[in-house]
Design a protein with these regions (language model features):
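Short hydrophobic/aromatic patches on the structural cores and recognition surfaces of FHA
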Residues: 34, 53-57, 62-67, 71-75, ...
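Intrinsically disordered, low-complexity acidic Ser/Thr-rich regulatory segments
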Residues: 1-48, 58, 98, 107
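Short acidic, gly/pro-rich beta-turn/loop elements at beta-sheet edges
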Residues: 28, 44, 67, 76, ...
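C-terminal boundary/linker segments immediately following FHA domains
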Residues: 70, 76-107
Length: 107
């Protein structure tokens, strides 16, 4: 008979999916980098007006956030430049005219 207590329940991290240029990406790292620098970014946008490391999607305490990494041209949301915003279902962000959408559902 085993008297050891069961291991603690650790809930799975929420799933986040990103849509860009007709492709769907699964965000499965705590910090997903978006930018133009190959080899340093998870999503590479080949545009000279996109910073080398432009923005990050970060998982913090069970919630996802998009964070501007000090880029020159910023991250847009609903016509405004943002530094950081919690991502909610259906959010769309602009990075120098490139639209990036987010969903917690994978159709």
């Amino acid at each position: 008979m085993n008297s050891a207590p069961p291991p603690p329940y650790i809930p799975a991290a929420p799933s986040l999916f990103m849509d860009y240029a007709g492709r769907r990406y699964s965000i499965n790292v705590p910090r997903f980098i978006i930018g133009r620098e190959k080899g340093q970014c998870h999503l590479v946008i080949l545009d000279p007006n996109v910073s080398r490391q432009h923005a990050a999607v970060e998982l913090l305490q069970g919630a996802f956030f998009i964070v501007d990494l000090g880029s020159r041209n910023g991250v847009g949301y609903s016509g405004h430049r943002i530094r950081r915003k919690q991502i909610v279902e259906g959010d769309q962000f602009e990075i120098n005219g490139h639209t990036i959408g987010f969903s917690f559902r994978n159709p």
